[in-house]
Amino acid sequence: MSNHDQKRDEGYIEKLVQVNRVAKTVKGGRIFTFTALTVVGDGKGRVGFGRGKSREVPAAIQKAMEAARRNMIQVDLNCTTLQYAMKSAHGASKVYMQPASEGTGIIAGGAMRAVLEVAGVQNVLAKCYGSTNPVNVVHATFKGLKGMQSPESIAAKRGKRVEEII
């Protein structure tokens, strides 16, 4: 697992989560291709992930970064943490995330940590169950973050005040 991060001109934080080598066997030998999984975020609630494939690692990473910028979502954060505890799953990967008090930090493993860091979450407790395949863990984390709503948006949908729903 690689954890490469850098800042770009647009103000996005980019993290390389995984590079995988795949070999296709043909008559003349093996053909190697590389798959890259990246996450991109602005540190203020916008986050995206992407996958790229190429015969060379830098090209695969570049394709993944472009895909991640096209696939961005907005996450409603509660200051530096999540709104509420949540569970999410993708394939055999299951993730659990819960808000944490100030000063806790990001207590999460591998691929989940990368997503939460670039999203701007600074205090969270998270656990991954089942498969720890980085692709499925990132998908499951995104499903959870995408479904999270602020109390203000829930109240607006119901036509009530925030105090009435809390």
UniProtKB/Swiss-Prot annotation:
A Pfam family per the record: Ribosomal_S5
GO BP field: translation
Molecular functions per Gene Ontology: rRNA binding; structural constituent of ribosome
Record's keyword annotation contains RNA-binding: yes
Annotated Gene Ontology cellular component terms: small ribosomal subunit
Record-linked SUPFAM superfamilies: dsRNA-binding domain-like, Ribosomal protein S5 domain 2-like
PANTHER family from the UniProt entry: S5 DRBM DOMAIN-CONTAINING PROTEIN (PTHR48432:SF1)
Function: With S4 and S12 plays an important role in translational accuracy. Located at the back of the 30S subunit body where it stabilizes the conformation of the head with respect to the body.
Domain remarks: The N-terminal domain interacts with the head of the 30S subunit; the C-terminal domain interacts with the body and contacts protein S4. The interaction surface between S4 and S5 is involved in control of translational fidelity.
Assembly, per entry: Part of the 30S ribosomal subunit. Contacts proteins S4 and S8.
Protein name per its UniProtKB record: Small ribosomal subunit protein uS5
Source organism of this protein record: Pseudomonas savastanoi pv. phaseolicola (strain 1448A / Race 6) (Pseudomonas syringae pv. phaseolicola (strain 1448A / Race 6))
